A protein has these predicted regions:
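Charged phosphate-binding loop/patch that engages nucleotide di/tri-phosphates or the phosphate backbone
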Residues: 84, 91, 95
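Short coil/turn motifs at secondary-structure junctions
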Residues: 76, 86-88
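Conserved binding/recognition cores within well-folded domains
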Residues: 1-80
Length: 95
């Protein structure tokens, strides 16, 4: 059983949903929206249609001139916020 504070991100790939931790990726028996609902009152935020990240595991954000946001996680994973979610993330960051 994974604890929410262990999870760096939750993502969908190939029709399956995975929780990524420092120890690897684990298959979840949930849809992404179900995982998002279960973690609604925590530090998790959706950054694209296929990914949710744990804000407590973010090492840094890199804003580019083109408006995209690159996210570096504590486990070394680098991912991007989709255009649809950029405004929401900027609001969370106070930008």
């Amino acid at each position: 059983v994974l604890e929410p504070n262990e999870i760096d991100r939750i993502y969908a790939s190939g029709g399956k949903v995975y929780a990524e931790t420092k120890n690897g990726a684990f298959l979840l028996r949930l849809r992404l929206y179900e995982a998002e609902q279960r973690l609604a009152n925590s530090s998790f935020v959706r950054i694209s249609n296929s990914e949710i990240i744990n804000l407590k595991k973010v090492r840094g954000f890199d804003l580019s001139f083109t408006g995209t946001i690159c996210v570096s996680l504590s486990n070394g994973t680098v991912t991007y916020v989709s255009r649809r979610y950029v405004a929401k993330i900027k609001q969370l960051l106070g930008l």
